[in-house]
Amino acid sequence: MKTLKFFSRRLTRAIARRLQLDQNLFHQNQLKLEAAKAKGQELVDVMPGINLAMVIHPDMYFKIGYTKYIFEPESLDFIRDHLQPGQTFLDIGANVGYFSLFCSKIVTPSGRVIAFEPGDFAFNLLKKNKELNKFNNLEIHQAGFGEKDEIVEFNSGAPGMEVYNSLGKIIHPSAAPDKFKTIPVQLFRGSTWLQKNNVQHIDLMKLDVEGGEYLVLKGMLEMFQSQKISRLLIEITDEMSKAFGYHPSDIILMLRDCGYNWFKLGSYGRLEPLLENDISKVSIGNHMFVAVSQKSKNQS
């Protein structure tokens, strides 16, 4: 019992020291970013969490991951534990490339990362970040996925608003509608584009398109029906779904019909099974859908 208490105290102290180190790092980063902003410059530095160089624009949304806290650590933990060298990662709604860069490092040059981001400001930073890290296995496209091939009007956010880029009306409570401009964007039907570009299998797909997720999934239905996508990491929000005329349950039922199990992404990237009667109580946040053939590999 004494031994257990001893190691418990050591672990507590170790965690406290780590938190203090993180706080010191974020404080130092805040000072560096303020200095860059005063000079009207962007900053190139290591982004905490993914530990890769990124262009840090003083006004971009993702500066919170540089100056305040590690952005979506649960998602990073899951990716770190499950994505392997040589595999394929598809990022729909890649923004400035936080996850695409992380996955490019993990899958190594033998793997493939495909990133789609329609927004002007976000895509420009995504392009810079790819060049900065010299990731030849990262393909970037200023376009989006949808239910069909078409050119649509897209709301592209200014610095600080880029995370709220959307095909729909800007309704997020943290977004300022006057900070967006409308630009024409090419949408591709996902299954068709992937077939044309010789993408036979996707080991992990991330989907975050501010409410348009259901339309993207409908355009990729064949890929899910044949379970050519092993895992899907998706942000589900009731409010954003309503803006596109559907309920999150529509996503859940569609993917279950295709043979996928539904999980909430918990602490340290652990998968927490969600049951049938949870459909009407979908919580905001990141969810994981895993093909039945992959279930036993992903619950640990």
Regions found by a protein language model. Give the residues of each.
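Conserved acidic-Pro-Pro-aromatic motif
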Residues: 192-299
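Short, hinge-like loop/turn segments at secondary-structure boundaries
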Residues: 131-133, 155-161, 248-252, 280-282
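S-adenosyl-L-methionine
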Residues: 1-129, 133, 179, 262-300
